[in-house]
Swiss-Prot record:
Identification of the protein by name: NAD kinase
Species of the source: Clostridium botulinum (strain Loch Maree / Type A3)
Record's function text: Involved in the regulation of the intracellular balance of NAD and NADP, and is a key enzyme in the biosynthesis of NADP. Catalyzes specifically the phosphorylation on 2'-hydroxyl of the adenosine moiety of NAD to yield NADP.
Required cofactor(s): a divalent metal cation
Family statement: Belongs to the NAD kinase family.
Gene: nadK
């Protein structure tokens, strides 16, 4: 492992001293290591990134999401040093950075392949790069008026309801927006997709888990303005068509997980027992 990328979120408190220390830790483990620094993921999606052996993310969970989308096509593993609020995906705290880098070069880690989503807008020829690690959300616009949705799974009608929106989430995203919408926490290596309605006007409409290979079609039957498509809470697009197709992407996010990190402990400390507001990024 000689080619290391570092992706820095410039909105976070990351001093030059912190970066110098990380350079030092890397070169202590491998004096020949080549380090390339990226800022706010700019240039990370270029073909040259394919040569990277790993990318360290200095930021929070939101920075991990952006990094995952940028690197998805290149199969480059990533891990995060938490400089955000929650640190569920970016699980390494700054004081443990040296130990994590040592374990990285010793090979004392495993790689988790996380499902990603892709989205197609019916009737639009141009294929935009709608990839998501957490979730893809279709919601009403600015008006406080609900929208009528009809859901099809593998071209079979599932249900129709009125609601503020619909979340389609991966297991990774099950601890994000869909959790707030009443969805279950899904163990991250399961091959499933989740549909979670947002504020449905019905007591009988509840989140559902589907086979990971399912194709989900969301049809907008009644609207007062164009709904909005949101990718991982970071990218959005007004939807002028009446149907959105969401399915599992052929790409996966490769997350580096160190052996001393326990998913259930992280779940307890970062989600279950967390009392202060999760501000996110």
């Amino acid at each position: 492992m000689k080619n290391i990328g570092i992706n820095i979120n410039t909105d976070k408190d990351i001093s030059r001293n912190i970066l110098d220390k990380i350079f030092q830790y890397i070169h202590e483990e491998c004096s020949e290591a080549k380090i390339k620094v990226f800022y706010d993921s700019k240039g990370l999606d270029n073909e040259e990134s394919r040569a990277l052996d790993a990318v360290m993310v200095l930021g929070g969970d939101g920075t991990i999401l952006g990094t995952a989308r940028a690197l998805a096509k290149y199969d480059v593993p990533i891990f995060g040093i938490n400089r955000g609020h929650l640190g569920f995906l970016a699980e390494i705290e700054l004081e443990d950075c040296k130990k994590a880098i040592k374990n990285l070069f010793k090979g004392q880690y495993k790689i988790e392949n996380r499902i990603m989503l892709k989205c197609d807008l019916k009737g639009i020829d141009k294929k935009d790069d709608f990839l998501a690690l957490n979730d893809i959300v279709l919601t009403k616009g600015n008006l406080s008026r609900i929208v009528k949705y009809s859901i099809y799974v593998d071209d079979v009608w599932y249900t129709t309801f009125v609601a503020d929106g619909v979340i389609v989430a991966t297991p990774t995203g099950s601890t994000a927006y869909s959790l707030s919408a009443g969805g279950p926490i899904v163990y991250p290596d399961l091959d499933v997709l989740e549909i979670a309605p947002i504020c449905p006007h019905s007591l009988g409409i509840r989140p559902i888990l589907l086979n990971g290979n399912s194709k989900i079609n969301i049809r907008v039957l009644k609207k007062y303005e164009d709904p909005v498509l949101t990718i991982d809470g970071q990218r959005y697009k007004k939807v002028t068509v009446n149907e959105v197709t969401i399915s599992k992407s052929e790409y996966k996010c490769r997350l580096i997980k160190f052996k001393d990190k326990d998913y259930f402990k992280i779940l307890r400390t970062k989600i279950s027992y967390r009392s202060r507001e999760c501000e996110g990024e």
